[in-house]
């Protein structure tokens, strides 16, 4: 395949080995100017220390570090949370939700510097290549896209380190890297190493944020979440921005070992992969939101919201954020959440986040109607006629079968 004619490219840069190699590789193979773009999505301050200097030492002409933490939580995580989306019943979509906000900001930097191409460091086996390039296609169809992992012949960390050493480019990466990790404000994922065999139990070093539930405090801790229109607006009586609320709950949940999952998932590209995911704050938020929904949503609305969550989980996971269907689904979920207002107390103990108290001014739960004791507001004899009509189709089918 012939190479594209490129003048200036913006590369999504992390400071790791792969993207440190990509910058000089782009200059050598495309004879172009390279601008580095770093997305701060809450992966940790330690990951950003000296990153501009690293990028320029690798050959970038400029490096832009963009703070996307609040935007990620407010505009991507919260709308997804309202749908109740779990991918394949367990995964809270941590990596999936971060990719579109990163891609959007990368396109904005490309427009700012007058670039004619975009570059990502995703491998040809994973989901992220589809997520990034799908976003690029929706937001900047005129820009060219370069995916080095689908072009170059570097196949090992040793080769990548040698590549940098030959060019006197400094890199602190080690030859051995046991795990592949991805972190943002919502979660951290761990893949590879011992996890490549499904018969191996995760080692303790497969977990980064959360305490082993067995080693967590013996005394439970309680957190109180205030929910307005399906969003957490305050925790323990203090108003917080979406990002700050998540940081606070991450700290509380991690201390008690909340939010660990070990799953085998179906990747978009067809293969299965295994990962250990930690989402402490997100797990607490989801439990609290679900508790208020149980009070507020009627049966058919709750069922519909469940359907929205299932579809949303696949759209987000599959890299279809910038599509009319994703927007429509989340608009519907947002409408359903207008009355999802309430207060929830969550107990954190030994890996569990358990709702112990919940209330809402919009609650459809009525003690007078739900009581199992003496009943003054509900005439139980009315149920007979309802049941006869409700089961009419079954009755007719049975009568027909007897003919």
Curated annotation (Swiss-Prot):
Catalyzed reactions: L-citrulline + L-aspartate + ATP = 2-(N(omega)-L-arginino)succinate + AMP + diphosphate + H(+)
Binding site for L-citrulline: 91, 96, 127, 131, 180, 189, 265, 277
Residues annotated to bind ATP: 12-20, 39, 121
Binding site for L-aspartate: 123, 127-128
Gene3D superfamilies per the UniProt record, alphabetical: Argininosuccinate synthetase, chain A, domain 2, HUPs, Single helix bin
GO biological process: one example: argininosuccinate metabolic process
InterPro entries: Arginosuc_syn_C (IPR048268), Arginosuc_syn_N (IPR048267), Arginosuc_synth (IPR001518), Arginosuc_synth_CS (IPR018223), Arginosuc_synth_type_1_subfam (IPR023434), AS_cat/multimer_dom_body (IPR024074), Rossmann-like_a/b/a_fold (IPR014729)
EC nos: 6.3.4.5
Pathway(s) this gene product operates in, as recorded in its UniProt entry: Amino-acid biosynthesis; L-arginine biosynthesis; L-arginine from L-ornithine and carbamoyl phosphate: step 2/3
Class of this enzyme: ligase
Top-rank taxon, per record: Bacteria
Localization terms from the record: Cytoplasm
Principal location: cytoplasm
Alphabetical UniProt keywords: Amino-acid biosynthesis, Arginine biosynthesis, ATP-binding, Cytoplasm, Ligase, Nucleotide-binding
Gene Ontology terms for molecular function: argininosuccinate synthase activity; ATP binding
GO cellular component, one term: cytoplasm
The protein's assembly and partners: Homotetramer.
Family stated for the protein in its record: Belongs to the argininosuccinate synthase family. Type 1 subfamily.
Identification of the protein by name: Argininosuccinate synthase
UniProt gene name: argG
């Amino acid at each position: 395949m012939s190479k594209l004619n490129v003048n200036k490219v913006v590369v999504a840069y992390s400071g790791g080995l792969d993207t440190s190699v990509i910058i000089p590789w782009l200059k050598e193979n495309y004879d172009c100017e390279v601008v580095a773009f770093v997305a701060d999505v809450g992966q940790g301050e330690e990951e950003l220390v000296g990153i501009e200097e690293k990028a320029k030492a690798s050959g970038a002409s400029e490096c832009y570090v963009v703070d996307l933490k609040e935007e990620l939580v407010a505009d991507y995580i919260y709308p997804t949370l309202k749908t109740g989306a779990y991918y394949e019943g367990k995964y809270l979509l941590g990596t999936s939700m971060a990719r579109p906000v990163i891609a959007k900001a990368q396109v904005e930097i490309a427009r700012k510097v007058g670039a004619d191409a975009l570059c990502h460091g995703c491998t040809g086996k994973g989901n992220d290549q589809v997520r990034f390039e799908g976003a690029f296609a929706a937001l900047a169809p005129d820009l060219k896209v370069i995916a080095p992992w689908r072009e170059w012949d570097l196949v090992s960390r040793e080769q990548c380190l040698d590549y940098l050493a030959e060019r006197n480019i400094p890199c602190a990466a080690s030859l051995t890297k046991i795990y592949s990790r991805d972190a943002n404000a919502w979660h951290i994922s761990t893949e590879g190493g011992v996890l490549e065999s499904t018969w191996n139990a995760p080692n303790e070093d497969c977990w980064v944020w959360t305490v082993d539930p067995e080693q967590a405090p013996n005394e439970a801790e309680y957190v109180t979440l205030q929910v307005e229109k399906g969003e957490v607006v305050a925790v323990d009586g203090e108003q917080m921005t979406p990002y700050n609320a998540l940081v606070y709950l991450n700290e509380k949940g991690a201390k008690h070992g909340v939010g660990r999952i070990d799953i085998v998932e179906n990747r978009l590209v067809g293969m299965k992969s295994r990962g250990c995911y930690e989402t402490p704050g997100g797990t607490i938020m989801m439990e609290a939101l679900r508790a208020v929904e149980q009070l507020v949503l009627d049966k058919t609305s709750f069922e519909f919201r469940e359907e929205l969550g299932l579809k949303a989980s696949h759209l987000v996971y599959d890299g279809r954020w910038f599509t009319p269907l994703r927007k429509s689904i989340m608009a519907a979920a947002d409408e359903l959440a207008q009355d999802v207002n309430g207060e929830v107390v969550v107990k954190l103990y030994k890996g569990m986040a358990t709702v112990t108290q919940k209330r809402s001014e919009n609650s459809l739960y009525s003690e007078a109607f739900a009581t199992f004791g003496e009943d003054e507001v509900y005439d139980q004899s009315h149920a007979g006629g309802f049941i006869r009509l409700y089961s009419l189709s079954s009755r007719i089918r049975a009568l027909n079968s007897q003919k």
